[in-house]
Design a protein with these regions (language model features):
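Active-site proximal beta-strand in glycosyltransferases
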Residues: 72-79, 89-129, 144
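Conserved donor-binding/catalytic core segment of Leloir-type glycosyltransferases
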Residues: 4, 183-204, 210-217, 224
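A short, active-site helix/loop in glycosyltransferases that binds the activated sugar's phosphate group
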Residues: 115-169, 176
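A short, glycine/small-residue-rich beta-strand->loop->alpha-helix junction that serves as a flexible
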Residues: 6-20, 203-204, 315-319
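Nucleotide-sugar-dependent
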Residues: 292, 306-326, 337-346
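Nucleotide-activated donor-binding/catalytic signature segment of Leloir-type glycosyltransferases, i.e.
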Residues: 235-295, 300-303
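A charged, aromatic-enriched C-terminal amphipathic alpha-helix characteristic of glycosyltransferases
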Residues: 14, 372, 376, 385-420
Length: 421
C-alpha cells in the first residue's frame, strides 16, 4: 500500500507531530508513506525548513501534484494559518486537494478543537466544500458529529445527512512509538524539579503552575517553564511578565515578582542545577526549545506538567490529548496532568476504548484546576521522589498504559478497517 500525507505547513505543533507519527506508523506497519508540504514560502518560518529537511519531508506544488495520483490513499491536513498566507496561496493548496488529486482515496484530517476556528472554517463554507469531494473525514469525533451547540455553523452532517456522514467519518486517535526507555535516568539520580513545557495558549493552563508555585517551592521543588513565546505570553498571560495591578490588569512598569526570564542568548540548561535556595521562590522561564534535544537535558527532572484541558472535554474523542504527555513518560518523567482531562478521557486497550478513566490508573498524577487537591498531589510527588523503587515502578506502569493507548499498530489497523469497511 502506498500512502501520501499532504499538509499546508510544517512546524513543531501537535498537528505536524501527528502527521509525522502517522507517516512512521504506515511505513512500519502498512506499506510505504511519503509526507509532502505545499510549497508556498508564506507557509514557513526558516526553522521550519530545517525541521522538514531533518524529517525528510518533501515539498509539492500544484504543478507536480499529479504524482500523488500514484498513491492508494492520501491524508490531507486542513492545516493552513490564513493570517500568514494570502487568499490565493491558501486556495492554491485547497484547489490542489480538490481538483489535481483525483485517483487515491482522499481522507481529510481535521484536528481542530477551538470553537472559534471551527466556526471560521464552517461559516465560510470552505470545509464543507472540500469535505463533500473527499472520501473520508478523520477528526475528533463528537466535536464534528455533535457540535450543533456552535449555532452559527452549518455542519457537514447537516448537508449530507447523519447516515452518509457516519459512512465518511472515522475518529482520530493519537499514535506514538515509545522507544526511549534505555535512556531513562535512574530514579535515584532525579532532580527534585517540575517543568512546564508548552506555549502560553490558554487551554494549556500554564497559569496553574504559577498558582501552585508557592506550595511546590516550599516543598522543595524547583519550578521551571519552557516554550513560552514572549509575544504570546504578553497577550495571554501578561502577569507572567509584569506585576499584577491588584485588579484585572498589570503594571507594565514593574516586572513580575514570580517569574524570572532567561535570555534566549544564555545557555538554556545550565541553571537546572541551581539550588532552590538561590532561586528566591521564582519560576525560571525560558522561550522556545528544540524538542529533539531538550530531553537530553530534562530527562533528569522528576516531574513535568501539562494542564491541557477543554471546557467540554467529554464532547471530544478519548484520544484528544497533547503529544508532550507521551514525550514526558517516554523520557522517564512522571507527568502531572489536568484532573478534568483524566476523569473524562478513557484509555484505549487492544485498540478499543475501555471503560477505564486515565485518572483511575498510573498514567500520571492529576491536579484539579482550582488546586483543591494540591496537598495530596505534593504528598504523592514526595512519596515517589523519596522512594526511587516506587518512582520507577510508577513510571513503568505509566509507560505501559500510554504505550497501549497510543499503540500505532492497532490504530493503523483500525483506521484502515474503517476506511475500507
Amino acid at each position: 500500500m502506498k500512502v501520501a500525507i499532504i499538509a499546508g505547513k510544517c512546524d513543531g505543533c501537535g498537528v505536524s507531530t501527528y502527521l509525522f507519527e502517522l507517516q512512521k506508523a504506515f511505513n512500519k506497519y502498512a506499506g510505504t508513506c511519503d509526507y509532502y508540504v505545499y510549497d508556498c514560502p508564506s507557509f514557513f518560518k526558516e526553522n521550519d525548513y530545517n525541521l522538514m529537511k531533518k524529517l525528510n519531508v518533501k515539498t509539492i506544488t500544484r504543478a507536480d501534484a499529479a504524482k500523488i495520483n500514484n498513491y492508494d490513499i492520501v491524508f490531507a491536513a486542513y492545516h493552513v494559518v490564513r493570517s500568514q498566507v494570502t487568499e490565493d496561496e491558501a486556495n492554491g493548496y485547497y484547489d490542489m486537494l480538490e481538483y489535481d488529486i483525483t485517483h487515491p482515496l482522499k481522507v481529510l484530517i481535521f484536528n481542530e478543537h477551538r470553537p472559534s476556528s471551527i466556526i471560521k472554517h464552517y461559516a465560510n463554507g470552505t470545509i464543507n466544500k472540500y469535505c463533500l469531494r473527499l472520501n473520508f473525514l478523520l477528526s475528533f469525533d463528537k466535536i464534528m458529529q455533535f457540535g450543533s451547540n456552535i449555532t452559527t455553523a452549518v455542519f457537514l452532517k447537516d448537508l449530507i445527512g447523519e447516515a452518509e456522514y457516519m459512512k465518511r467519518f472515522t475518529p482520530l486517535y493519537h499514535l506514538y512509538e515509545f522507544n526511549n526507555i534505555d535512556n531513562w535516568v535512574p530514579a535515584a539520580a532525579k532532580i527534585k524539579a517540575i517543568e512546564y513545557l508548552g506555549r502560553a495558549a490558554l487551554f494549556k493552563d500554564a497559569h496553574r503552575l504559577i498558582r501552585a508555585n508557592d506550595k511546590l517551592q516550599k516543598a522543595g521543588y524547583i519550578v521551571e517553564m519552557r516554550g513560552l513565546g514572549y509575544k504570546e505570553t504578553l497577550e495571554n498571560l501578561p502577569d507572567f511578565v509584569y506585576e499584577s495591578d491588584g485588579k484585572y490588569g498589570v503594571d507594565r512598569t514593574k516586572k513580575s515578582p514570580i517569574t524570572y526570564w532567561i535570555s534566549p542568548n544564555e545557555d538554556q540548561y545550565k541553571l537546572l542545577d541551581l539550588p532552590i535556595e538561590k532561586r528566591n521562590n521564582k519560576i525560571y522561564c525560558y522561550g522556545n526549545y528544540n524538542k529533539y534535544e531538550i530531553y537530553n537535558h530534562l530527562n533528569r527532572v522528576a516531574y513535568a506538567c501539562d494542564f491541557f484541558n477543554l471546557p467540554h472535554v467529554e464532547d471530544y474523542a478519548d484520544s484528544l490529548m497533547e503529544y508532550c504527555m507521551c514525550e514526558f513518560i517516554d523520557n522517564g518523567i512522571i507527568p502531572i496532568l489536568d484532573n478534568n482531562f483524566g476523569s473524562n478521557s478513557n484509555i484505549i486497550v487492544d485498540g478499543k476504548i475501555s471503560n477505564t478513566k486515565f485518572n483511575e490508573t498510573c498514567a500520571g498524577i492529576f491536579l484539579n484546576k482550582d488546586l483543591s487537591n494540591i496537598d495530596e498531589v505534593i504528598e504523592k510527588m514526595d512519596y515517589l521522589y523519596n522512594n526511587p523503587i516506587e518512582y520507577d515502578k510508577f513510571r513503568k506502569e505509566s509507560l505501559e498504559i500510554w504505550k497501549e493507548h497510543c499503540n500505532p499498530k492497532n490504530i493503523i489497523e483500525n483506521l484502515l478497517e474503517n476506511i475500507y469497511k
